Amino acid sequence: MADATEDILRRFDCKASSPIKVPNNLSQSYQMADDSSIDLRDYMDRQKSSRNYSDSEYTPSPIKREKPETKQSAHLSTTTRLPPISPKKLFASPTKNYSQHVMQERSAPNSPQKKSLPNENDDLKNLRLEMKRLKQEYNVKIENLNYKLNLITKERDEIMKENIELTSDKSRLKTQNDLLSVDNDNLLKRKFESEKQLKNSEMKILSLEDKVEKLVSLNKSVTVKNMTMKQSLEGIQVKLKKYYDLYKECQEKHNNPQDSPPKVKIATPDPEVETQNKALQPQLQIQELVQALKNLTIAIESKNDIPSSELHYLVKILKELIAKDIFRPSSPNHQTQPVFQSTPQSKVESVNLENVPPESQPSHVSSNSQQNLSDKSRTSIPSRDNPSPNVLRAEEPQDFHNANPIQSQPKEWTREREERDGSTGYSIRSDMAEIKEFLKFLVDGVKNDQKDTNSPEESNTDGKEEEEKVHIEDKSCHCKPVSNHAAFCPVCLNREDFTVSHFLSQ
């Protein structure tokens, strides 16, 4: 304590000290350097009550001063008495040795003795006050430092909180980063797959473009082929028209020029002539009926005006011929025995077609000329495989190739019109279908009959005669009669690769 006091005294000077900044919340207790608190009031009370009069040089006792008594005046008795103003003593500079200074003070006439110190030196009192002031400054500084420390602690706590929040944000962002990295990996995989698909689609597009190019080239080639086929078709049409004109010219030459207006007249022939023809040529009546049906079919298809009474009459004749069902086999020695046994031997109504114009019968061939045709000229008769479109356009019945189709379907041919369509008038379309179906096997029968009746020798001689005539004559249409009846010339029948039968079949 003495050393500290000496150090303080050495640093002491007479300069005025700076004012002490005391905070507002300053209390009477001060914090010391050794963390011990001192209450100034208690300390001063203890010092007053118990004085230390020991001769210790380390703890000098304070000097007690006695105040001089003052006389009270009469006029100031009622008022408050103020202390006298005494001049302040200047603080003299102390000696270097504190103990010597104390001894000087004690050896002075007014200094206190061992246990009684009536008066205290002003310098010592000032020193104590200075120590007190220094303690106060020290405590104030400590208080300020504590205040600053508290602020710094608060800031540290806030910073710690922010740090904790930042660490939590960091962890959260880390998890988000992990998730985003996973998403990035997935997106990279998808990108790789999409690139693969894009490459595949590009390859497909290239292949499709190649196919398109091939199809375009194929389309061009097909277009060229189509143009060539169209040109060839036009040439064939021109050729067909030429042959059709030639065919029509031949037909006009063979037709009777004295034909009357376009009417199909069906007349009943004389019975005596019919019996003579039947006795001489049994197939002639059937051929005449076939030719009449041909002409009638052509007239219907060319949309000429045909009276319904004549048509009904012809249908009636055909139905009577079928309904009689007279199929008597002829003698084996007879030359004109038919191939099929369904040839009707009943009375057949003949047809007079002399007044039919050439436009209504372009495919007309005389019935008398069909017996004397050669093998080449006989090809003009339509066969079963290639029927004529103007004559044999009806479909074949289901039982057509039976042994006897008429006998297998008697009800189909003999049924009445009321049972067939339930109407009061004739159905021309159904009647014509039946006529065409019946006409189909009639023509085949006549053709087979003619092949059987004509001997091979006669057919060969006829073929040779026709070939000689063809070589002798030019390759132009003469259409001269081959026999007693009118017929087509071989040039018209076999001109280049085109024949009349082929034309009719088309």
From Swiss-Prot:
Function comment: Plays a role in mitotic spindle pole body organization, possibly at the point of spindle pole body separation. Required for mitotic exit.
Alphabetical UniProt keywords: Cytoplasm, Cytoskeleton
Localization of this protein: Cytoplasm, Cytoskeleton, Microtubule organizing center, Spindle pole body
Biased composition (Basic and acidic residues): 38-48, 63-72, 412-422, 461-470
Sequence segments annotated as region (Disordered): 18-121, 252-276, 329-429, 447-470
Chain ranges passing through the membrane: none
GO cellular component: cytoplasm; mitotic spindle pole body
Primary localization class, coarse: cytoplasm
Residue stretches of biased makeup (Polar residues): 50-59, 94-119, 330-353, 361-389
Protein name: Spindle pole body protein CSA6
GO terms, biological process: mitotic spindle pole body organization
